[in-house]
Every structure is written in structure tokens, then in C-alpha cells.
Amino acid sequence: MLSWERFVYFFPKVIVKFPVTLEIVLISFGSGLLLGCLLAWIRIKKIPVLSQIAAVFISYIRCTPVICQMFVVYFGVPALLGQMGIDSSAIDRVVYIYIAYGLNNGGFMGETFRSAVLAVPMGQTEAGYAAGLAGWQTLV
């Protein structure tokens, strides 16, 4: 049940943190978009070793819950940096959340972009080449 009194009481407390949420969304979306484009390009071009690494990464990201990925990045990366002799205490903890969400978005976007590009019929691509368009222009 929705209690309007509780809603009115908690809404000002929640809305104060809205800029932080928006910042996490925008940064993770931007980094995920870049990573997704890179992963899709690697998989489409079938670069020998990188294509297999990208396929494993995408499979891992798509098959594990985001909360598990957040735990691995949030607790694992500082521990790994500590093992390497790098002090991670100066790094703000929200950076690890940016990384976790960015990797998650990148994995999903990479597969989405790859499937979208491969869904274009070959005749359409050949028509673009016949019209004198470059490779990247036929993609756009």
C-alpha cells in the first residue's frame, strides 16, 4: 500500500541523491557505449585473439547478475591493486560503481550493436559500396 504521508516524508530525502544517480547513469552509459562499439567492431572484424576474448567477456557479462559484477569490481579491484602494491584508498569508491556498470552496459551494447550490424542484408551493404560509399558510411 502506498502511504502518501510516508511518500511526502521520504521524497525530499531521496531527491537529494538524484544528481548522484544521474551521474552514475550518464557515466556508465557513455563508457558502456564506447566499450560496446569497440567490442562489436572486434567481433564483426573477427580479429583472431581479440574476437575470442570479446566473446568470452560478453558471455560472462550477459550471464551473470549485475550485483555479482558490482561485488567483484567493488571488492576485487581494490584487492588486486593492493596485491600489485598500488594504494587504492585515494580512489573514490563510486569510481568502482562506474566501472562495474560501464562494463555491464558495454557487454550488452556490444552484442546489440554486433547483431544490429549483421542483421543488415548483404545486398544493402553492396548497394552502398556500389554507390561509392566508404565502409564506415555504409554502416551509418
Language model segments and positions:
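Transmembrane alpha-helices and adjacent helix-loop boundaries
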Residues: 1-140
